[in-house]
């Protein structure tokens, strides 16, 4: 959810840049909406909480209220699911009802784009921006691939103070480490991660690390890895973000993100923090690592094995092709670009 919404911001920014007088509304689940507070390209965040998503009648009621209160000139249905199509169903007088080509979208969307075509080799941001193309009928579109998050100076200052109290020395680099994942199949081999972190600590004596994890299994996993590393003083295991905006403030106060691909990496890129991420076979790096002005690199099985060889291997074997040596070589190459 975080990654999808983050990459969608480039479309919001493209629309605001192209139509500065337009009012841009962004529809999101409530649990991630706080990230987009204060965004200059988003005039209003419309949220759906659990009680508004279910039962279905409650969802329909909320969609009807939103569409009838706002009477939109343009609806861009980025997901184009049966549920999201109700925005267009209740807005048949809206001149531009834009979305994806699917079998069931023909009747309700009057501009459809194939953002998941097998012929596309573009990243997710570029695919999202295809949805702005029908608006070229109004005026030329000024596209941007930049997606940004905005924190207040006070938010960043408060979290920096907390980090200092926990022992962070801002005279030295601070790495945010995506050491674990919510979904087990997306997590790089734990022993490989331990080997790589040990080598970073050995060869970069000034680097400090903060492990990023959520409560529950992720925290348990992160603390086990910390113990396996020998509980080094340079890893601050107890620095925790209690909300998404605090996670953003944590990212904003770090020098670099390294680790498993996920929402925190997208947040880092949106805050112009450089990164290097490890992509599982189930997450296409070419799609989910968008290129823009921020240094963001990564590694996936596609960088190592040709498709015909991957076709003969199990998921685990493909993931294991990303060895600590390959990760370290590419990580250090990325770090050299920064220095």
Q: Language-model segments: which ranges?
A:
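Catalytic machinery of carbohydrate-active enzymes
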Residues: 1-339
